[in-house]
């Protein structure tokens, strides 16, 4: 059974991924720009998509752009940022109603592709720079976005763990950049960053919906003019050397302690034992039937929440938990016990089957939405590999208990980070 009908084609420096499906009443256009993560560029790149969404050459005023979106039957457009290991990804999303369901015959798909191309390739400029008013306004918003991470202690403690684990790596950088670097960005500098990104980034466009592939490809050729580029090879930059575990404790005015523990897995998305790592994580802390949830949260009542997740491009496994400050030692100890139990193979065939079923359902739920489907496929484009969804699911299904234990042998404790409250914290 084939879950996805993905047609790939090259258009200059852009790879198009047309996913024909009758599942959705809308068509999703998802444009991605991927580049190395660097301290020098990350804050500018975080600002860039939000400035681009303010106006285009044809619609230089934001209000005019919004009313044009309304004319296209309420087409919506948004942007966000993610990290894939040591790479930074800018995503633009445009969702349009499928013209097949409209009474009149407006060529909405072509207009949507034209608008997306215009947002990315024909921005509103002042000379050789972005419009200074838009840059100033979006700089303020970006600072608020960065500050929001510091105000949300769950996200902040995760950031601090990564900063400590990956001190000398680009991965330590936050996806939105550094708050201290925002003020210095000029409209001219931002335009230089933009020009470099358009010329050098890996560009991928996903078109998901009930569409005609030939029509989409000719519209891409017409509107998305990009030059061919050489993409850098993807290096597995996970460390295989022996890790020296460390403990870092911060103190702030928080009521609930945040205990985050980071491990090095030495396994990334393209590795053969990645499916075994996924099952390992599912058994350890990925789901509500996992060891962390049952033993740390339910049985010992030590945590408000306890879960784990893997970073599939950097080779990390991270435990997140919220605990009473007084329970720090006990929580660290019981999490270590659960981790050791995993390494010892202290789980049944029934546990494995249950975990595989949950992973399978999770994947099928993900690809049941246009955005989830494009994200799943983009994991592969970013990693420069091709694994059909049916193969991905079969690889999970074929994982044995021995495979899980073997994957566990590679995992090493790296950093224990604790954010604890000051005395009398509210």
Swiss-Prot record:
<feature type="binding site">
    <location>
        <position position="50"/>
    </location>
    <ligand>
        <name>Zn(2+)</name>
    </ligand>
</feature>
<comment type="similarity">
    <text>Belongs to the peptidase M16 family.</text>
</comment>
<feature type="binding site">
    <location>
        <position position="138"/>
    </location>
    <ligand>
        <name>Zn(2+)</name>
    </ligand>
</feature>
<keyword id="KW-0862">Zinc</keyword>
<protein>
    <recommendedName>
        <fullName>Probable inactive metalloprotease YmfF</fullName>
    </recommendedName>
</protein>
<dbReference type="InterPro" id="IPR011249">
    <property type="entry name" value="Metalloenz_LuxS/M16"/>
</dbReference>
<dbReference type="InterPro" id="IPR050361">
    <property type="entry name" value="MPP/UQCRC_Complex"/>
</dbReference>
<dbReference type="GO" id="GO:0046872">
    <property type="term" value="F:metal ion binding"/>
</dbReference>
<dbReference type="Pfam" id="PF05193">
    <property type="entry name" value="Peptidase_M16_C"/>
</dbReference>
<dbReference type="InterPro" id="IPR007863">
    <property type="entry name" value="Peptidase_M16_C"/>
</dbReference>
<keyword id="KW-0479">Metal-binding</keyword>
């Amino acid at each position: 059974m084939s879950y996805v009908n993905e047609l790939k084609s090259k258009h200059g420096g852009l790879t198009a991924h047309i996913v024909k499906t009758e599942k959705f009443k809308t068509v999703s256009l998802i444009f991605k720009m991927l580049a190395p993560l660097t301290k020098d560029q990350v804050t500018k790149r975080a600002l860039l998509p939000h400035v681009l969404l303010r106006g285009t050459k044809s619609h230089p005023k934001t209000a005019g752009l919004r009313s044009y979106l309304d004319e296209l039957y309420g087409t919506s457009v948004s942007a966000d940022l993610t990290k894939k290991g040591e790479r930074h990804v800018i995503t633009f999303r445009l969702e349009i109603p499928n013209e097949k369901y409209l009474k009149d015959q407006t060529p909405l798909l072509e207009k949507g592709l034209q608008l997306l191309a215009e947002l990315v390739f024909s921005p509103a400029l002042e000379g050789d720079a972005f419009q200074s008013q838009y840059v100033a306004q979006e700089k303020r918003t970006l600072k608020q976005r960065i500050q929001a991470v510091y105000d949300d202690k769950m996200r902040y403690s995760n950031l601090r763990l990564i900063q400590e684990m990956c001190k000398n790596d680009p991965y330590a950088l936050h996806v939105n950049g550094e708050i201290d670097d925002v003020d210095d960005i000029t409209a001219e500098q931002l335009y230089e960053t933009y020009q470099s990104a358009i010329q050098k980034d890996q560009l991928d466009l996903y078109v998901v919906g009930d569409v005609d592939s030939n029509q989409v490809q000719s519209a891409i050729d017409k509107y998305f003019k990009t030059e061919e580029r050489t993409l850098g090879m993807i290096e597995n930059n996970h460390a295989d050397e022996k890790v020296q575990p460390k403990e870092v404790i911060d103190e702030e005015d928080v009521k609930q302690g945040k205990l985050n523990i980071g491990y090095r897995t030495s396994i990334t998305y393209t590795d053969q034992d990645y499916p075994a790592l996924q099952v390992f994580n599912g058994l350890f802390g990925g789901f509500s039937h996992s060891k962390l949830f049952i033993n740390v949260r339910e049985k010992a009542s030590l945590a408000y929440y306890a879960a784990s997740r893997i970073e599939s491009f950097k080779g990390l496994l991270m435990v997140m938990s919220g605990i009473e400050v007084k329970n720090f030692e006990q929580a660290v100890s019981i999490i270590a016990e659960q981790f050791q139990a995993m390494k010892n193979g202290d789980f049944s065939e029934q546990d494995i089957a249950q975990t595989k079923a949950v992973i399978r359902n999770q994947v099928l739920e993900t690809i049941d939405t246009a955005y989830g489907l494009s994200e799943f496929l983009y994991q592969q484009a970013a990693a420069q590999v091709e694994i059909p969804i049916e193969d991905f699911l079969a690889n999970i299904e074929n994982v044995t208990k021995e495979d899980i234990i073997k994957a566990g042998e590679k995992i090493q404790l790296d950093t224990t980070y604790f954010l604890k409250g000051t005395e009398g914290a509210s």
